[in-house]
């Protein structure tokens, strides 16, 4: 093993150990782990200039995003999804578009960014983080319908935001994209991703029917998560929707099997995998955030944060009918690693690239701390802890 490889492995192991330690501390103080991980990472990164052992970008997404998305989709409540399908679709598609355009309109109104660049920024920060939200909801007694809406919306929202990011990137790059062309591209990317995920899940299910060993089911689900994502990405459709569809379809098909022990083993594996990936990704997210840069453009930062949270408040009236549900929905709109990865993956030639990255740093940090920190405490106050469930 070369020195560089050994150093990278050691750095990754150290990051993992630190992430797990911080996650355990977060559980003790009842703060969402994602919040404490990012705050600790930002302090270490800004004060001691510690960098993660990998760079944020498409390669990172291909490694960490499939298992994180798969685990959330694997554990989602399908019965509640069916009941709330209309609300979820409204929030995920028109809702994400509304959020992106509202943020873009605010930034262009105060003249910190031209509208095409502002729309690119809006698309980036419209991607909420399902992992951080799910981690909180598993410890509280929130209504099943509200949980399903927030979890499914955050999954679908990420997929829509990534597609919109590609369209906005083409606009900023000088390509002429008519609204109907963009709409068609969005529909094809989402539909294509769902189709790819479904087509990948069916042969996986047929293969797993012949095997009664839990370790084969675990290996099969891991392979499926990556295969669906990579095939979809290769075909130019949504990898996030492909991975989500693959998990949902395979889970629905496997439910009919009688071997509950195997399913429990698969559940335990994915919970552990998500916990580890969550710890690494969010601590690395904090290390990437440069605190001085996050306040470098105060007008852009203030406008972006207010517009981001404000658009979430407006969508809360679609998500829930009562004050507790709306408050929970607003606070669950945390941003995480995906917006950072999208911002840092921007080509160098993109106008105002540095300002976009600075603004994304700020939005991710503020939404995680301001919205994420009180989330679990308030949801517990509204609905009670999980142990109160009858």
What would you call each of these model-derived segments?
Residues 1-390:
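Transmembrane helical cores of multi-pass secondary ion antiporters/exchangers
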